[in-house]
From Swiss-Prot:
Heterodimer of an alpha and a beta chain. The lineage of its organism: Bacteria, Pseudomonadati, Pseudomonadota, Gammaproteobacteria, Pseudomonadales. One of its GO terms (cellular component) is cytosol. It comes from Ectopseudomonas mendocina (strain ymp) (Pseudomonas mendocina). Keywords: DNA recombination, DNA-binding, Transcription, Transcription regulation, Translation regulation. This is Integration host factor subunit beta. The keyword Transcription applies. This protein is one of the two subunits of integration host factor, a specific DNA-binding protein that functions in genetic recombination as well as in transcriptional and translational control. GO terms for molecular function: DNA binding; structural constituent of chromatin. The gene is ihfB.
Length: 95
């Protein structure tokens, strides 16, 4: 699902909200979440999951075109851990 598809679904289910209002709310929420992660904060949405940063240590990688070894610096990457309710719901839908 894309961001625009999410906006359409919310507008369809919440008829009293305009498309512009929903778009602004989603953009604001995503911007706030991005800022929180950028400052090292953890985000927890109960029943859905949590977002945090995981550190990837420096390592030696390979350039896929040349096969030459390349040193890669350590970095932080966003990580999502689904909550129990989300895991249960996903597994329930597969049955």
């Amino acid at each position: 699902m894309t961001k625009s598809e999410l906006i359409e679904r919310i507008v369809t289910h919440q008829g009293q909200l305009s498309s512009k209002d929903v778009e602004l709310a989603i953009k604001t929420m995503l911007e706030q979440m991005s800022q929180a992660l950028a400052t090292g904060d953890r985000i927890e949405i109960r029943g859905f999951g949590s977002f945090s940063l995981h550190y990837r240590a420096p390592r030696v990688g390979r350039n896929p075109k040349t096969g030459q070894s390349v040193r890669l610096d350590g970095k932080f990457v966003p990580h999502f851990k689904p909550g129990k309710e989300l895991r249960d719901r996903v597994n329930e839908d597969e049955s």
